[in-house]
Amino acid sequence: MDGQEHAEVPNSMVEDDQSVVAAEAIAELANSTGEPNPEEGEEQSVEDELIAKAQKLMEDITSVANNPNPNILHALSQLLESQESLFLEENGHFSNARGSHNSGKLCILIRENDEFFELISSTFLSENSYSTAVKAASARLLMNCSLTWMYPHVFDDAVTENFKNWVMEEAVKFPGEDSAKKEASDFEMLKTYSTGLLALSLASRGQIVEDVLTSGLSAKLMHYLRVRVLKEPSTSRIHTTETKHVSLKTKEEGRSRVRKIVDTVEGDHVLETDSGREMGQTDVQPDGEFEIDGRDVFNVSGVVDCKIKPGDDNSVRDDPSRHRLNRSKSRGRGRVHEGAPDTEVLLASPRLGRLLVRDRDLSKISDGRNAEDVTVCLGKMKSGIMEIEREDNDECFQGCIIGTKNITDLVKRAVGAAETEARAAHAPDDAAKAAGDAAAELVKTAALEEFKSSGSEEAAVSAATRAAITVIDAAEVSRNPTCVTSDQTTDVSEVSLPDIESLAQLQEKYCIQCLEILGEYVEVLGPVLHEKGVDVCIVLLERTSQLDDRSTVSPLLPDVMKLICALAAHRKFAAMFVERRGILKLLAVPRVSETFYGLSSCLYTIGSLQGIMERVCALPLVVIHQVVKLAIELLDCSQDQARKNSALFFAAAFVFRAILDAFDAQDSLQKLLAILKDAASVRTGANTDRSAPEVMTSSEKQMAFHTCFALRQYFRAHLLLLVDSIRPSRISRGGVPSSMKPNIRAAYKPLDISNEAVDAIFLQLQKDRRLGPTFVKAQWPAVNNFLASSGHVTMLELCQTPPVDRYLHDLLQYAFGVLHIVTSIPDGRKAIAHATLSNNRAGIAVILDAANISNSIVDPEIIQPALNVLINLVCPPPSLSNKPPLAQNHQPVPGQATTRPSTDVAVGTQSTGNAPQTPVAPASSGLVGDRRIFLGAGTGSAGLAAKLEQVYRQAREAVRGNDGIKILLKLLQPRIYVNPPATPDCLRALACRVLLGLARDDTIAQILTKLEVGKSLSELIRDSGGQSSGTDQGRWQAELAQVALELIGIVTNSGHATTLTASDAATPTLRRIERAAIAAATPITYDSKELLLLIHEHLQASGLGDTASALLKEAQLTPLPSSASPSSIAYSTTQEMSTPLAQEQWPSGRANSGFFTSKPKVCAHDEDPNSRSNAALSAKKKHLASSTLEMPTPVAQQQWPSGRANCGFCPSIPKINARDEDPSSRGNAAPSAKKKQLTFSPSFSSQSRKQSFSHDALPQSTQRINCCSNSDPALADTSETAAELVLKNDLDADAQFKTPISFPRKRKLSELRDSSVPGKRIDLGERRNSTFADGSGLQTPASALDANQSGSSRLGQMTPASQLRLPSDPQPSNPERLSLDSLVVQYLKHQHRQCLAPITTLPPVSLLHPHVCPEPKRLLEAPLNMTGRLGTRELQSFYSGVHGNRRDRQFVFSRFKSWRSFRDETALFTCIALLGGTNHIAVGSHAGEIKIFEASSGSMLESVSGHQAPVTLVQPYVSRDTQLLLSSSSSDVQLWDASSITGGPRHSFDGCKAAKFSNSGLQFAALSCEASRKDVLLYDVQTCSPCQKLTDTVTSSRSNPYSLVHFSPCDTLILWNGVLWDRRIPEKVRRFDQFTDYGGGGFHPSRNEVIINSEIWDMRTFKLLRSVPSLDQTAITFNSRGDVIYAMLRRNIEDVMSAVHTRRVKHPLFAAFRTLDAINYSDIATIPVDRCLLDFATEPTDSFLGLITMEDQEDMFSSARMYEIGRRRPTDDDSDPDDDDETEDEDEDDEEEDDLDRILGLAGDNSDSGDDDLSSEDNEDSVSDFDEEADILIDGDFMEELIEGENEDDGNGEDEDDDDDGEMQDFMSSGEEDDYRDNIRSS
């Protein structure tokens, strides 16, 4: 080893100086340890004296750095230890306040002396030239200094390697291992302190840990603890993983290897080859030590054994710069000893048992010969660092015989001294060997020369001796240069060194510290178990847990518990620890502040291992209760980390019923809630200026996070146990209910409370109609206690925390997880719905805020659990539904039979597949139950159901009142960019479920209908891509489709989740849905003789002339005219016949878009087989029908009942190939289409039905469709369903057509309609451009396969018979079949649906001619042309016809011409007002100025500075003869006399803003400037005093800076921010729902409507009338008559820069304004101004407009402009086209040509003109005609009907209004009467 001493020739001067210094330091140290002076001044002087002494000692060391005296280092260590002892006496062993004590100050002083610290931490420990005593003293001093290190010091690699080698040194035992020794050697001291320093190095992790793990050190340390603790005799240790005698290269390679984790390491030990060496060492001295005159102890075992230590290489002498202290390394990972002062205790500074060793002069050696021998030994030790030892037969030792004398010893001494000198100078091995050779040659040469000259052998030996002494002296001189210090005359004193027992105690502690760091690694487990580590830990725990005389625990106890915690991470160790009653030992540990962390760490480590916790839970109940009690006490302790560990223990242990029961038995829930309540109270930030996230410290956040997680686990476990306890028992095999033997979960078995398991429980509670009602009625004490303690309020308080960091983010998730479980019971829902937080916020508002998308930021991990809570609050589960399971998905029809067909039972039982054949309550197929709750017929069920309904109703009202609809609609936005891809569909599906629950309320359903939610949902369904059902995305898409269709069925009044709603979702407008609904409800009748005539034609065309004649004769029919006789092209046997379709006159071709939509093509050779196939099919269907139906359909029936089947029908068939067309095609078209329709339905109903119809994984018998019977089942759909199912099973057998159901993207889908009532069919008549894939993969809509539109269908390439393989496949039994009557009725219904205005009462419909409902002629309407209207007004009617005024408005207010501009180069205009009747305009500027301009000349008349802030609003009002002007800024309001503003304002109003006059001008309203208050202040204009204050007391986040105050026309009502006040009563009247973040709006001049952003509300009923998308985000102004609305893009008036915000620039109205008809809210025009629009103003005569536009956004320059209304910009060749007669006709033609563009919403987009071209020539007509036509149909809530493309509503005449009377009845505020009155007055 490199810890050997030098061989040195004494230098008396150096020794004396160092001895004097050490003696003086020790003497002063003894004086400094006396009693402290109580006076402050003397204490300061003592402190200064100590620092001076320490400084002096350091200087003494640094001055002789090459040859330091270890006693000085020991003196400095003694100084630190004495001060540490004083600190411990004053503060105890666990204080961390050393920094302010003398002990800490001395350590800091040493640490900050870079030169000295470099010596003791690197140079002395890494250089081989320093003695063991110096290294031991340095290590001792470093350990004393480490007490105050904030971070672990990072030692050099060479130093850490030496630490490891010294600890691993086998030649030296650990202190205390040899009981015979009483004194500690330097090497033992070095080994002990190296162990401590190694523990410090391991704390910084890194490569040193890898090296130590592979070195077998852990086994050595554990063995020592075993010997010390268990008092077992020391034996040879074999736990080393490497041989000691290895080369340097091997060691370096081993260091770089990464350790491998192995299962066992017990066999990886190599027996050391020289294990008997220790016995041989005792021949020299015990443990191989020499004492030289009692001064120093040197280990010379290497000399005696003639063995070279492998670690004593020259690798540490590579580069001196390597040993420089790297200051950056000393700032490590964390605080080591300040935070855990228990690691250094009295053991670090033992005060007893010191060994006193006197320094003696080397000259007192009595025997020079012995001294020479020792010198030789030392020299040999110095040379022992060579890798290759010089052998006795070495060349340099040859020729040492002089005569008879042998001078080999002298030569060896000289060689050793020379090589030692060379190596001390860091010379390489070759140079050292050369030096040795030279010294040998010198000695031999001197002897030979003397012998030759004198011939005397004695003289030759003397000469050789002198030469050898010369070499040795030279080496000593070079090694020990003379360093004379200051004069010191004091005698040498004695130094205090730790005795053997003190070192043994320190060694024990350092071993524990090392193992506590290494214990978590698997490599340590084997050695620990081999050395009885479990017993050692238990004994240590028991021994250190004993209290001493001062009732304090052992300082070693925290380290022992840390060691147990580290080793308990291994299951093997933990299991043995529990088996050997280690838990009881832990429970016996004193519970004081010093042990809290260790106890909590052990509990958490054991609790996190479920296998170990099973053993713990199997212990006696008393022990389990004590464990839980201990964890609860730790929750209340003062240490944060211990509290966190305890919370984590509970979170991991709550999966065991034993822990759960013990926890509840001690009423411990209050402890968890108390922690969370404290965190919630801190989170509110009371009495602090910091924000909520900053109020909570990091530790508080972590504690709240862990506690909330534990609470969620607690409720999850309770939920699982409760459901298990109430789960309906199944019948055992013996017929005895299993409830007779309750299956109680074992208390020691873990519960599965994972996310998947909890989701499965909630799904079961939702679906199971037995378990659901039982769960509602069950008592849940845990939740009741939680609610009684206001735990739900605490959770909501925590949910208000913004998720700004990870802990708060996860805290919200767990809090919502708790609320999700709590709201599953009625009491929890009621408590949450009525909860009010400390800041007066509603609990529902907090949940909605968490689910809100703010600033396009989507956090699905927060939104999803929040939506789950909302679902529990507003959505009754289907298991509590009042409706039967099957009726859940189908809207009942009057007269429908309530009993299910007998086939339903068979289908229901077969569809269960492998389910147990036990009676199971049928589950509801929907996702949300009905409004009515049904809990069975038990006692009290009705009352409880009523209470549940009331709670759900209150929750819905609370969600609506807190803008819940707006938040949920945001989640349905088509573009939500979040990851993973399934997340948007998940959030949308959950949001739809919440909306579906809200829609159980009729009022909310009506609102959703008006908001056209169905249209948004249809877009979502079409956008969702087809994903595999096995993925999360596919699952969420399927659920989204299901719940969206169910919601559409409610908001469109078209039933629940049926195929009809699929059609509704695919339809772009509600108008089409209503039209289909009217047609479906219309009874259809027809003349049966016309049908017989068609059959007669069909028979003739088929070549059955005799049969046709017989029919003609028997039915007494008159044949159709010959012109109507059909050509036989459809059924010809010759392929050459190709008569055009226009010439074909067969009956079905008479109807335009009739029975077949595609062009028939024939093929001769396919006629007969298909005819036979259809004949067989018909016979089989007839047989099946006769065997199952009780009421067979009559064969001959002259008059079929009308309206027998309210069913839709597909009138078109796939394109048939010419060679495939035959008579069977007519028979197969309907069943083929119907089959495909039915297979679409299950995918949008229940999950079970969707699975049974998706693929052929189930038997064909399970793939049936349950259909409730119609009022007349014999005549309805029984035959249809049979054929459908026959064909479906055939198709399912063909795997090539099995593809998943998918929606086409962004394409229009066909309408679907019910063919019987429950089993709705797909009506594909109106589909043009899309296809649908049914459950078997076939594309269903025949219209999509039309030759002109689609050619991709495989079905269209073959005949139905060959496609479906009817002849060859067996047909299953089917009780229903198609009838000719149903086919005809469906065909006629389809024709009726195509009518533009279908009516509900029809005469018998002709089969021979196309059916078209009569349309209004609109003869009384005013002409579209303006000239025509003027002429009509003069000649025919005083009002020029119906809608004359409306079309005049559209004509006038679509034309605007720039008239004049007003600029001021020095001002930025912000607002404008037109002063009526004065020809003046007033503008406000950003500088706070008010400027008056003359309108006619554009010159500025007056300018005055009235505000300190930018002017935001100016509003004029004429009061008698005075023109008043009201100006506002962000801080005050000024009232001016507009006739002379230079005289100053009439009055100033501070503390208010955004003022607006009332309509009477007697008052004005303003808003309070205080951001925290929501007050509307009313002032009297005459007295200028406040007259009223209206306050919005609801604390919500709905307020926005855009809202202004609005007065009603009669000034009695006030509207602001969606809140309506009546000035005559103190409270608010109404809070309107807001569906966007843009508040504002205003009162309609008709007084019956109020506008909130884009929604129109009825003032009389407070119902939503309609939604006008054109008004979204706009600020509106009415013209003077109140029949036209001007809309400009809303902005924050207090910030002019907000006008040019990036998002605002992209809006279409950024540089434009819009005009709308205020009667029906239809768009008139969108007028571009090509500049950013800031403000807008009107004047009473409706002749001019005033605008403020920003001319230059970069320079922020704006101007005011005035526009003429009703005039257009002159063109290049015509100055005024409105006055030019030559262009009038052309203008009118343009207007008529652009009518369609206006209907399509394209009005106002023509901006080809220049900056002043504000005309809109294509906006003379309005889209309102559609609206008024729809008013009669669906309550007047439709805004417009979009033209859908070719072959659809062409709009000719459809846009005209035919229901003005209905409109006036439904909307009294629409003002149509005003039009008539105005016309009358004008006449």
UniProtKB/Swiss-Prot annotation:
Biased composition (Low complexity): 1238-1251
Reported tissue expression: Ubiquitous but predominantly expressed in the inflorescence and roots.
Record field: compositional bias (Acidic residues): 37-47, 1773-1796, 1808-1864
Chain residue ranges for the region called Disordered: 1-47, 309-340, 882-924, 1157-1202, 1214-1260, 1310-1377, 1763-1883
WD repeat residue intervals: 1464-1503, 1506-1546, 1548-1586, 1587-1626, 1633-1671
Phosphoserine sites (modified residues): S349
Pathway entry: Protein modification; protein ubiquitination
Keyword Phosphoprotein set for record: yes
Keyword Phosphoprotein: yes
Polar residues: bias regions: 888-917, 1330-1362
Motif (DWD box 2): 1655-1662
Residue ranges with Basic and acidic residues bias: 309-322, 1310-1329
Highest rank taxon of the organism: Eukaryota
GO BP annotations listed: embryo development ending in seed dormancy; flower development; fruit development; leaf development; phyllome development; protein ubiquitination; shoot system development
Any matching Pfam family: LisH
Oligomer and partners: Component of the CUL4-RBX1-DDB1-DCAF1 E3 ubiquitin-protein ligase complex. Interacts with DDB1A through its DWD motifs.
Function of the molecule: Component of the CUL4-RBX1-DDB1-DCAF1 E3 ubiquitin-protein ligase complex, DCAF1 may function as the substrate recognition module within this complex. Appears to be required for plant embryogenesis and to affect several other developmental processes including leaf, shoot, and flower development.
Domain writeup: The DWD boxes are required for interaction with DDB1A.
This protein's name: DDB1- and CUL4-associated factor homolog 1
